[in-house]
């Protein structure tokens, strides 16, 4: 299973991004492939939150357009919305404490915890995911993948 990060989904829909073509091709291949795609709620709503923000994009999506994209993903047979296990909040907090950081890593830690819980690989262009020990990740823009590090106590 793959779990996409918000940044790749935004690149796939932002034609002004230098990563647009690669991200769009990756996302289309992921949705039309046979491997499972897990969507985390934090990713779904992060896509809507950032994609509609005029402070982030010169031409942001409308709420209707962003919702339409999300709905088009959810009807794909390979897509499933991931359920967080009961200890998800504690797992995220342990990851953050282990890193000794929070701030901008809070969303990444939520995605990382779900990936670790589901044995999934995070697809991302965000190098911060390298900081989570034991996490498998892949950057479809560069083709670089993680070398799986042993899990730490926080994982």
Predicted regions and their residues:
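Short, well-structured N-terminal submotif of metal-dependent ribonuclease cores
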Residues: 1-3, 7-39, 54-68, 145-154
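Conserved glycosyltransferase catalytic-site signature
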Residues: 6, 41, 105-109
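Structured helix-beta-strand junction loops
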Residues: 33-34, 76-77, 118, 132
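Short beta-strand segments at enzyme active-site cores
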Residues: 38-41, 82, 124-125
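Extracytoplasmic
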Residues: 47
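Ligand-binding beta-strand-loop-alpha-helix segment within the catalytic cores
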Residues: 73
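Active-site neighborhoods of divalent-metal-dependent phosphate/nucleic-acid chemistry enzymes
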Residues: 78-123
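Acidic, PIN/NYN-like endoribonuclease modules and their adjacent C-terminal/linker elements
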Residues: 112-155
């Amino acid at each position: 299973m793959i779990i996409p990060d918000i940044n790749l989904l935004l690149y796939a829909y932002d034609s002004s991004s230098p990563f647009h073509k690669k991200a769009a091709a990756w996302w289309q291949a992921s949705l039309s492939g046979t491997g499972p795609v897990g969507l985390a709620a934090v990713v779904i709503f992060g896509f809507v939150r950032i994609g509609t923000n005029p402070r982030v994009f010169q031409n942001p999506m409308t709420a209707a357009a962003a919702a339409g994209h999300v709905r088009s993903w959810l009807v794909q047979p390979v897509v499933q919305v991931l359920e967080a296990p009961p200890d998800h909040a504690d797992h995220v907090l342990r990851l953050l404490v282990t890193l000794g950081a929070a701030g901008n890593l809070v969303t990444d830690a939520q995605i990382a915890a779900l990936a670790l819980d589901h044995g999934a690989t995070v697809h991302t262009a965000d190098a911060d995911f390298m900081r989570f020990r034991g996490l498998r990740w892949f950057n479809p823009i560069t083709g670089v993948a993680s070398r799986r590090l042993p899990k730490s106590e926080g994982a």
